[in-house]
């Protein structure tokens, strides 16, 4: 079965999707789901994205089966490294998705994307440099999510992270991930745009050239209409490049 390995329900501060609705939609689409509720320990608003993990498991364990798995999306930051690692180890997740939602102490959506003192190249380089720092430091995740996350929100004329401008640092990131046995996500949110798809093909091809073999697929759905969105285009990329889509169960890779 195909799995959407990046889905948020009402246990994430930015979603009000009910698990029952998510399950119904997944059944309709014939896809499995891994719920990846947000835990962003250093988020600027201390009341948001602080997942109550015991409550999450207490409420959702009854829904867990071969087609519905329980994971978490960890915001990888430096100040709370020890706390985040402890929470990653303490509970029996099926899957841990690692994400970069901030550049050092600046949340990307709230603050970093509003900066007007950086060129396009500087903006993306700083983000990728921080990503390199955290993937080097952290071992407590299985797949790295949406490396193109800031591209959703920036207003540059060329709104893509490209190999042409960032090949050296992307190589470093991919080599670290591969050496640690981590994989990367094809996040499908932006795969409705031909320019984005072509750019993604270049970047994922480089991941493959460096020894990457596997990817996870994630819609980053926060509502039922986005579950498994653009998966057809994602499969086109994996087939073209010879990358193998996988999902995780009990922190172990499984094949579609």
Regions found by a protein language model. Give the residues of each.
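Conserved beta-strand positions in the central sheet of alpha/beta enzyme cores
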Residues: 34-35, 97, 145, 185, ...
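Extended substrate/RNA-proximal surfaces in nucleic-acid metabolism proteins
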Residues: 47-179
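Residue-level recognition of alpha-helix initiation/capping sites
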Residues: 16-17, 125-126, 168, 198, ...
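An N-terminally biased module of ancient metal coordination in phosphate/nucleic-acid-related enzymes
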Residues: 1-78, 83, 87-94, 153-164, ...
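Active-site-adjacent C-terminal substructures of enzyme catalytic domains
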Residues: 165-227
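Short, well-ordered beta-to-alpha junction loops that form the rim of enzyme active sites
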Residues: 38, 146-149, 188-189
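A cross-taxonomic marker for long C-terminal extensions/tails that follow the last structured domain
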Residues: 137-140, 248-256
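A structural alpha-helix within SAM-dependent methyltransferase catalytic domains
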Residues: 23, 27, 135-136, 174, ...
């Amino acid at each position: 079965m195909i799995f959407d390995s990046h889905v948020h329900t009402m246990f994430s501060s930015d979603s009000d999707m009910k698990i029952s609705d998510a399950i119904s939609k997944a059944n309709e689409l014939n896809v499995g789901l891994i719920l990846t509720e947000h835990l962003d320990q250093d988020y600027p608003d201390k009341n948001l994205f602080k997942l109550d993990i015991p409550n999450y498991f207490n409420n959702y364990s009854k829904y867990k089966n071969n087609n519905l798995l329980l994971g978490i999306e960890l915001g990888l930051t430096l100040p709370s490294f020890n706390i985040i690692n402890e929470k990653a180890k303490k509970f029996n997740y099926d899957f841990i998705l690692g994400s970069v939602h901030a550049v050092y102490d600046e949340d990307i959506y709230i603050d970093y994307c509003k900066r007007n003192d950086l060129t396009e190249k500087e903006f993306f380089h700083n983000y990728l440099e921080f990503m390199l720092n955290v993937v080097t430091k952290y071992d407590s995740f299985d797949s790295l999510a949406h490396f193109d996350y800031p591209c959703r929100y920036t207003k540059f004329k060329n709104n893509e992270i490209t190999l042409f401008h960032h090949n050296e640092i992307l190589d470093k990131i991919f080599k670290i991930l591969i050496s640690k046995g981590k994989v990367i996500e094809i996040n499908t949110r932006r795969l409705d745009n031909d320019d984005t798809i072509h750019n993604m093909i270049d970047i994922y091809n480089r991941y493959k050239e460096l020894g990457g073999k596997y990817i996870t697929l994630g819609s980053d759905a926060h509502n039922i209409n986005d579950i498994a969105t653009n998966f057809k285009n994602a499969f086109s990329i994996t087939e073209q490049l010879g990358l193998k889509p996988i999902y995780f169960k009990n922190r172990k890779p499984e094949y579609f």
